[in-house]
């Protein structure tokens, strides 16, 4: 008989601080929704983009997967690049939208935090509401600075800008 899961996010925190955890934590930086669907036999992807009740069900199922499969934490990221105007160079092979200093100066940098929270606040609230006891979330805003820059500039264009305007 498999024992009832007893997640403890402290195990991952201890390992991260190079302290011996009570037990070795189970962690994955990301688990594909299609993989979770295949393992559990339940739908997730369609719920993720639905209305609020769909999204509640998504987070209930999503967090339950991590608990039931022995994880101490729930991995969740909301991609910053998804709220960037003119995005798509990194993930969708579109031309970058920033090609010059003028484009850079005209870009709505000050709006980005509001756009991110507008899009994802409810998701983080629902994640917190459905977090199993003993677990914590790992992740948050996904994408680093370089990924975000690549997504609105494009890698090739970034190389040209570096040569043409190194101070940018």
Features from the language model and the residues they span:
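Catalytic cores of TIM-barrel enzymes
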Residues: 1-168
């Amino acid at each position: 008989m498999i024992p009832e899961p007893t997640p403890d996010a402290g195990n991952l925190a201890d390992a991260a601080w190079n302290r011996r955890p009570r037990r070795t934590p189970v962690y994955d930086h990301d688990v594909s929704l299609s993989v979770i669907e295949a393992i559990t036999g339940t739908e997730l992807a369609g719920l993720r983009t639905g209305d609020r009740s769909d999204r509640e069900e998504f987070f209930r199922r999503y967090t339950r997967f991590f608990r039931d499969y022995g994880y101490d934490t729930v991995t969740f990221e909301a991609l910053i690049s998804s709220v960037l105007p003119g995005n798509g160079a990194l993930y969708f092979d579109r031309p970058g939208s920033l090609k010059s200093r003028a484009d850079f100066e005209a870009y709505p940098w000050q709006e980005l935090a509001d756009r991110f929270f507008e899009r994802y606040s409810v998701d983080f609230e629902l994640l917190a509401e459905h977090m199993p006891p003993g677990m914590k979330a790992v992740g948050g805003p996904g994408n680093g600075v370089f990924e975000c820059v690549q997504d609105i500039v494009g890698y090739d264009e970034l190389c040209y800008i570096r040569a043409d305007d190194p101070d940018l």
